[in-house]
Amino acid sequence: MTFSKIKDAINDFKKGKFGIVIDDKHRENEADLVLAAEKCSPEKINFMIKNARGLVCVPMLGKRLDELKLRLMAKINTEFTKCAFTISVDAKKGTKTGISAYDRAKTIKALIDRNTKPSDLAKPGHIFPLRYNKKGLSKRAGHTEAAIELCRLAKLYPAAVICEIIGENGKMAKMKELKRFAKKWGVRIIKIQELIR
C-alpha cells in the first residue's frame, strides 16, 4: 500500500519521526518531508538538507509570527499557491553564520521558544517561516496548513519543519521515487486530502 493511515502518521509524528505529505495532483503535485518543530535536532535538519534537498521552511501560526514581528516577505503575493513566506531569520544567540544544520535547528527552536523576542532574531537569515492560513485546510490545502494540522492532531506545538523532496535528477520527486524514499528511511506517506476529510 502506497499511502498510510492518518492515525499511523500522527503516531509517528508524535514520536518525532518524519512524514511525507503530498498535495493534490492539480495543485503543486509535490511532496514535502515534514517534522514537528519541537522534535527537530541538528541531525534531523541535516537529514532533510541531504536527502530531501529542498528549502527548509517553518510553518507557524500568525499569532506567533506577529509576536516576533515577522512580516510577510512580499506585500503583494503573486506566487500561484499564495505561499505566505515571512522575512527569513537566524537566531542571534548560539549560532555562527546561520546556514549549518546546527544553526538552522537552533533558529527553529528559537522561533518556538516563548522567551524569544523579536530582537533575538537576525533578519534576513537562513530559515524561512511560513504563515499558516487562519482558515486552515478548508481555505488553502497546502503543505503549510497540512503540517500545522498534523501538529494539532498529534497535540504538539503548532509549528513544523518542511522541506520539498527533490529527486536525484534535480526535478521534483514523483511517486515511484517517493515510494523508494519512504521504504529506505521508514517514512509514511499521506495525502493532504485525507487530512481534510
Please place each PLM-identified region on the residue numbering.
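Catalytic domains of riboflavin
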Residues: 1-197
